[in-house]
């Protein structure tokens, strides 16, 4: 597999993470190991007003296929600079929530090029993504152990734990909503639809609020069902399309009132525009931000490869809309 986020995995700088603590009593950034999971450390960013006692919301930020936790830290920054105020972790620090950047599984000669087992994988559907999926890595189990470890070290509001991610990380967010709904409050998936349902059954224990973000000009996870047309490798098997994923969630959430569409302001004039589609009559919020002309990138995020490879990066909005959706949800 030629990793989509190769440049992210090999670039610097990264967050300056300090040593892990048995119990965090104040703000900061630290790298910790997950017990029982070799070589799958995570970075935890706690907000400046964290006091070790008052529980804070937590966003789980999952890297794309071929990336890692450091790559995820840069993906959400407009210029890829982790000190920039545009980054997800900077937004978190300004708004009083924590961010968790975990590692998927690496293999072979390039172990820092990691993937998540987001599901799929048979004679008809792509395995998302790579060897983590092909080898059946128990990433749902990993996330459970990861959350156990974080909750044991820091004061986390367990009614407000969210998952987000790009591409393979977005698809993994969908899988967590299907299989870990007792712990994941809501998800915001970017550029990665629910591949898990192509070979597995999505049966959440509770209605999970879902936001899905996707560009209509995404060559790496095409908006319509199809095979990728960018350096991700893996043959000709397709990714699931966005319409199927949204229809499935609408059925699972009992949405029976139709949809409402709203055009968001075109402030950047970057060749992309965004339409917010909201399903009504649902047991939990369901929204889709359809980025007309948008590529395989985090909104107002890092253009980690050239536009001819991943398509345009939308600049009209960014982490604030993702947090607006997630932060409004509670178990």
Predicted segment positions?
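Extracellular secreted precursors and ectodomains with disulfide-bonded cysteine-rich loops/domains
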Residues: 8, 18-19, 30, 75, ...
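Alpha/beta-hydrolase
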Residues: 60-62, 190, 291
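Extracellular low-complexity, Gly/Ser/Thr-rich intrinsically disordered linkers
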Residues: 141-142, 285-331
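The feature captures the conserved acid-bearing segment of alpha/beta-hydrolase catalytic domains
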Residues: 185-283, 293, 320
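A domain-start/cap signature at the N-terminus of enzymes
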Residues: 11-58, 81-86, 90-98, 160, ...
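Sec-dependent N-terminal signal peptides
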Residues: 1-9
């Amino acid at each position: 597999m030629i990793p989509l986020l190769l440049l992210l995995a090999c670039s610097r700088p990264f967050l300056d993470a300090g040593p892990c603590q048995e119990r965090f009593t104040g703000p900061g950034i630290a790298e910790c190991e997950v017990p029982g999971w070799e070589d799958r450390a995570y970075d935890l960013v706690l907000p400046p007003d964290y006091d070790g006692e008052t529980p804070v919301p937590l966003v789980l930020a999952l890297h794309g296929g071929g990336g890692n936790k450091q790559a995820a830290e840069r993906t959400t920054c407009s210029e890829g600079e982790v000190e920039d105020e545009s980054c997800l972790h900077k937004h978190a620090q300004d708004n009083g929530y924590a961010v968790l950047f975990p590692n998927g599984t690496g293999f072979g000669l390039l172990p820092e090029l990691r993937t998540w087992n987001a599901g799929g994988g048979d004679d008809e559907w792509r395995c998302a993504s790579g060897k983590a999926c092909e080898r059946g890595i128990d990433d749902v189990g990993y996330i459970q152990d990861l959350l156990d470890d974080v909750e044991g070290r820091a004061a986390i509001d367990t009614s407000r734990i969210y998952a987000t991610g790009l591409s393979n990380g977005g698809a993994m967010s969908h899988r967590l909503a299907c299989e870990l709904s007792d712990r994941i409050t809501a998800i915001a998936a970017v550029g990665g639809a629910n591949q898990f349902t192509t070979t597995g059954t999505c049966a959440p224990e509770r209605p999970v609020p879902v936001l899905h973000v996707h560009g209509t000009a995404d060559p790496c996870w095409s908006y319509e069902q199809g095979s990728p047309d960018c350096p991700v490798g893996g043959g000709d098997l397709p990714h699931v399309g966005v319409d199927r994923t949204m229809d499935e969630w609408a059925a699972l959430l009992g949405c029976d009132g139709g949809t409402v569409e709203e055009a968001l302001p075109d402030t950047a004039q970057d060749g992309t525009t965004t339409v917010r589609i909201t399903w009504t009559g649902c047991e939990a919020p369901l929204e889709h931000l359809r980025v007309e002309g948008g590529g395989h990138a985090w909104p107002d995020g890092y253009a980690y490869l050239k536009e001819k490879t991943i398509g345009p990066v939308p600049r009209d909005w960014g982490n604030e809309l993702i947090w607006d959706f997630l932060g409004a949800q509670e178990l």
